Structure formats: structure tokens, C-alpha cells
Amino acid sequence: MSSSAGISRRRFLKQSFAFSALASFASLSQKAVAFSNLASAAPQDAFAAEILMIGDWGYDSNHAGQTAVAAAMRKYAQQHGLKPEALFFLGDNWYGDLTGGAQSSRWQTQFEELYPASEFPGLAYAVLGNHDYQMAPADVNKVEAELHYAHSGKSRFTMPGRWYRFQFPAKNPLITFLALDSNMPEGDGAGGRKPGTDRRGFIVMTPEQKAEQLAWLEAELKKPRTTPYLAVLAHHPVYSDGPHGDHTTLIHDWDPLFRKYGVQLYLAGHDHDLQHLEFEGHPTSFFLSGGGGADLYNLKIQQSQRGPFANKVYGFSQLSVTKEKMTLRHLDSDGKLLHAFSKTPSGKVLIAS
């Protein structure tokens, strides 16, 4: 390990984990963390259940980023002999107009053809992003269009509702997912905004929907655990080193529940980059995959300040799950491995970076 890499990791440990000078690996009150070299990152496991994921992908103008990332996903799966049992689409599925709604030609050209069933035969689970609400209902209500397309029975695109629960894989499940709508009404109608819009003027969920979802979330988290892992996915990150920053509403409403019920993983997009954040004493690993095709954003906080990983880059991510551990990887638009970590059911984290 180079000295510069060592300094970066020590800074990260001081910031996020109260670094102990007594050992090269941090031993923490609720989370054990170790580092390994990226070159020796956990190899592909033939017995793992596999998921590939992207966020912020359905751009309405320049499709070069989306096309490159989709091609890298297909090539990566072929090279490693993967047949992912699911894809995750972490919101901002459609930017701009979706003319024709559920019958729009964009479904074929930007979803079915770029992520073909021949390469990705599993279901494609999706959550709603702010751009999915954007412009609705001025032209086409994209939220309703996505729900309608998912319920048509003609596609792998899966969205049973604005929020929903599923287990993965379908046979002998290893992980329970709670998929949420993170488009929050932030002081509805305040600051001269139109009622029912966020700070950017985008349509959002109603206060009643927000309350209903929050009650549903806690009820689901209270249920007896039947899988080794519990994860939540939504579009907006709770914490982010990108320009959107930390989300005060989600920190207030969701983060206490994640801590209380021991949610092990939170998946998000929204900031157009790839991130992985860990915090001292927090049971949740925060994993952001927003490099699916939309224009990239500059980071606001560098990974040396808060990490362990943040990179302004197009790319996709992989989640591999076994009984012993779940492994998450960030890869760029060439399929190059940028960052990886594994986490056991007890919460021990091994970071390769």
C-alpha cells in the first residue's frame, strides 16, 4: 500500500470510525472494519445470488453515457459468466417527456434493448426518482406510466407500487428489500412554491402518502427477520458527498429507524457518481450508484474527508449475496473495478479500495 493511500485511509478512519492506533484494522463498538488491496478483492462466487444496479439512467437527450454503461454491464456479465437474477433501477428512470406514457417508444429503445432479457433474465426492480415526478401531470404522468408499464405483464420492469417489499432470490431468499419513494414534500407550499412541489418545483408525494409510507416502513421493519440481510432502496441518498448533500428529511424520518432495526444496507442514486459511506456506530452501509447515464456531477466532499469511496464517473454496481456475506462492487463504464467491500450478517465490513 502506498503512503498516499495509507494517509487517505487513516483520514477516513479518523473521520468515520474513531481510528484506533492500537491496530491497523479498526475494531469498533458496532462495526468491525478492515481494508484489503483492491487487486485481491473478493473474487466472483459461483454460488452467490447476483444483482446489477444503476441509477439516473433514462436521459432524454444525449444517450452516450447510458449506452456505454449498458454495454459495460453486458460485457461484464459475459466475461464473468453472470446471469444476474435481478437488476435494480434506482430512480430517475425517465428524464424529460415520456410521450405515449406506458406505450412510449423509449421503453423499447432505452430499456428493453439496452438491458435485454437474453443477458439479464431476472426482474428489473425500480424505484421513483425526482425526474420521474418531473413535469407530471403537465404532459404525461410518468409515475402512473411506470406503474402501468410494470403492471402490463409484458416486461421485466417491476414496480408493484410506489413502495413495496420483496425478498431475493425468490427461492431460498437471503436478503429482504424494502423499496421506498423518497420524493418528500418538504414544507408543502412553503417559500412561494406551488403546493405539492419540492424545492426545484418538481411534483412530489403528498403529505398523506409520506405518512402512510413511514408507517408502512416501520411496520415492515418490526416484522421478525427471515433472511440474513435487510436492505432499503430508494432514489435519494440519506447521506451523500455529492452536490445534493445529506437529506435532512430522510435523516429525520428514516435514519432513526435504520439504526433502531439494524438495516444493513441502503441503496440510492440521485447524485451522478458512485459512492460508499460508512459511519461510526451505524449499522447501515450507504451505497450510491448514480452513474447510469445522466450528466455527471462534481463531488462536494472528497473521499479523503468522508468515505471510504466517492468518484465522479459513469458506471454500475454489483451486489453478490451468500449466507456468509454480501459483496458490493462499483465498476466504471469500461467494466473496471473501482471499489468493493463485503459485509457479514453480524456487520463486519471488509473494504477493498
What does each of the following model-derived ranges do?
Residues N130, S182, L233-P237, H270-D271, ...:
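Short, well-ordered beta-to-alpha junction loops that form the rim of enzyme active sites
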Residues F309-S353:
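A short C-terminal boundary segment appended to hydrolase-like catalytic domains
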Residues S2-A23:
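N-terminal secretory signal peptides and thylakoid transit peptides that target proteins
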Residues A26-K31:
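C-terminal segment of classical bacterial N-terminal signal peptides
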